[in-house]
């Protein structure tokens, strides 16, 4: 009898071990939802919290944290933020995406920040049934259809940024027919895509385009700057690292060139790109200058003292959108990744801290948004268009 019970115990233990092993081996797509409308729901976030874009990522994280902290003070339904650091590295983004996808309490994702990162994580999040929404990835093809219903963004894409930048160069910076503009990409997909759009837009206006390319790790731009002539009105720098634009603009001025540096949204960092007289385009307004946002900004600075950049606020809006989607799913007693994803796509906010409404198109793009132009004046980013 003892031996029989021993055999039964061994068999039972083996069965339990097999079940546990099988469960731990389940792909993220099969992770059972464990979110609870009474105990709380989790939203994941991917951002470059450290690394070359750490100041941007920290700002993005802080604005999302701030929204959920404020939400949790006044709502019975608690929303928890699960953060992961990508360092603006697609491989790290993939690794952290797997972790979030495997966390069954996570009902949606804010991020990642970069277009290359979005491409890397998209198959993972789609397989896991998760909505993921970026407050900064602008490459046009990200909403081309492959991830429809899964990927969203609350900032305009480069099909808006490119023509906006080109038109400003043409109408305000002297880049007219017969003159030239140097367009320099940093060999990354976001950069090359935006460079293509700006180059094509300028060429269509009769502007000569000198298309160049450098590594994202380059520090000496003398060979390129030597090609800048008196007819070159603008050097367009659609980089993802602000310090690289800083080096280029400094070297441009040091060599006595009159062309102005013009950075894209990836260079928007007032602590790292500070060359006086340079221009930058950006997908969001500076919320610190919007009177209607004064109380929100004041409360944000109370929790997170110090400077903030326009990179952060779109993530506040995404957090707000997720809060709406989760609330709707809980109201319908259908809390699940699929239900949150469906409700997120239908979110309609009549007004946000970005100065306008939020609604997503069928592709997942934000409807009706625009890019803004800033000029660096004595170390400050001043909105000029």
Ranges and model annotations:
Residues 45, 100-113, 131-135, 179-185, ...:
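Periplasmic-binding protein-like
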Residues 49, 150-213:
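An alpha-beta-alpha
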Residues 249-317, 330, 377, 381:
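Extracellular/periplasmic periplasmic-binding protein-like sensory domains
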Residues 93, 154-180, 193, 219-221, ...:
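Hydrophobic alpha-helical segments within soluble ligand-binding/sensing domains
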Residues 28-36, 55-62, 70-144, 154, ...:
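Beta-alpha junction/loop-to-helix N-cap segments that form part of ligand/metal-binding clefts
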Residues 302-312, 323-380:
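Segments of small-molecule ligand-sensing domains
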Residues 1-42, 74, 385:
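Short, low-complexity disordered leader/linker segments with a strong preference
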Residues 125-128, 194-285:
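Extracellular/periplasmic bilobed ligand-binding domains
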């Amino acid at each position: 009898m003892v031996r029989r019970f021993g055999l039964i115990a061994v068999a039972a233990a083996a069965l339990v071990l097999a079940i546990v092993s099988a469960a731990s081996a389940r792909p993220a797509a099969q992770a059972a939802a464990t979110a609870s409308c009474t105990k709380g729901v989790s939203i994941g976030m991917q951002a470059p919290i450290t690394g070359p874009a750490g100041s941007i990522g920290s700002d993005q994280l802080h604005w999302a944290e701030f929204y959920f902290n404020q939400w949790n003070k006044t709502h019975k339904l608690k929303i928890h933020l699960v953060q992961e650091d990508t360092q603006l590295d697609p491989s790290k983004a993939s690794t952290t995406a797997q972790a979030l996808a495997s966390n069954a309490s996570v009902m949606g994702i804010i991020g990642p920040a970069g277009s290359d990162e979005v491409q890397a994580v998209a198959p993972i999040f789609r397989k896991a049934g998760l909505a993921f929404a970026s407050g900064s990835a602008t490459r046009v093809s990200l909403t081309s259809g492959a991830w429809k219903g899964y990927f969203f963004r609350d900032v305009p894409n480069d099909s808006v940024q490119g023509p906006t930048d080109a038109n400003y160069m043409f109408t305000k910076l002297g880049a007219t027919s017969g003159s030239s503009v140097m367009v320099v990409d940093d060999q990354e997909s976001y950069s090359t895509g935006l460079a293509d759009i700006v180059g094509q837009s300028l060429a269509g206006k009769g502007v000569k385009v000198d298309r160049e390319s450098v590594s994202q790790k380059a520090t000496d731009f003398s060979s390129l700057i030597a090609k800048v002539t008196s007819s070159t009105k603008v050097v367009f720098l659609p980089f993802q690292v602000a310090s690289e634009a800083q080096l280029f603009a400094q070297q441009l001025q040091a060599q006595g060139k009159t062309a102005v540096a013009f950075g894209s949204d990836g260079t928007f960092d007032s602590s790292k790109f500070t060359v006086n007289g340079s221009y930058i385009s950006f997908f969001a307004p500076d919320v610190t200058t919007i009177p209607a946002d004064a109380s929100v900004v004041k409360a944000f600075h109370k929790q997170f003292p110090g400077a903030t950049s326009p990179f952060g606020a779109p993530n506040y809006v995404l957090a707000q959108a997720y809060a709406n989607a989760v609330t709707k799913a809980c109201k319908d007693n259908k809390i699940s990744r699929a239900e949150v994803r469906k409700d997120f796509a239908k979110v309609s906010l009549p007004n946000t801290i970005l100065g306008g409404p939020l609604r997503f198109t069928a592709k997942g793009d934000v409807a009706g948004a625009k890019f803004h132009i800033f000029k660096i004046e004595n170390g400050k980013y001043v909105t000029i268009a």
